[in-house]
């Protein structure tokens, strides 16, 4: 099964939205990586991983960049996200 990783921070309403979207889609098996306490280093890493995005949340499937909360919501609503996570 493909692995979903989501970079978040604790006080981010968009990150809370992602958690809700994933729960509504029945997706419970994902890794949440908090940037709290190491924001500068993690934001630099996000810039490198995404090709320029430094904001959170940002999502990856098997190290392939998927997008932000809007992208995840769109993929979850269409059912595509579940298909992307299937083995």
Where are these regions (language model features)?
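Non-catalytic, surface beta->alpha helical segment in thiol-disulfide oxidoreductase systems
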Residues: 61-87
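Short, low-complexity, polar/charged sequence segments that are solvent-exposed and flexible
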Residues: 24-27, 49-52, 78
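Conserved short-loop catalytic and cofactor-binding motifs
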Residues: 30, 34, 47, 69
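Local sequence-structure signature of Cys/Sec-based thiol-disulfide redox active-site neighborhoods
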Residues: 1-33
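Amphipathic alpha-helical interface surfaces
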Residues: 14, 18, 42-45, 68, ...
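Thioredoxin-like thiol-disulfide oxidoreductase module
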Residues: 35-54, 83-87
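Structural micro-motif
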Residues: 50-60, 69
């Amino acid at each position: 099964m493909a692995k979903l990783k989501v970079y978040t921070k604790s006080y981010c309403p968009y990150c809370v939205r992602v958690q809700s979207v994933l729960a509504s889609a029945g997706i419970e098996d994902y890794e949440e990586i908090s940037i709290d306490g190491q924001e500068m280093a993690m934001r630099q890493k996000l810039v490198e991983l995404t090709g320029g995005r430094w904001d959170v949340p940002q999502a990856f499937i098997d190290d392939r960049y998927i997008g932000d909360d809007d992208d995840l919501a769109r993929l979850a609503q269409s059912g595509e996200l579940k298909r992307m996570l299937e083995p």
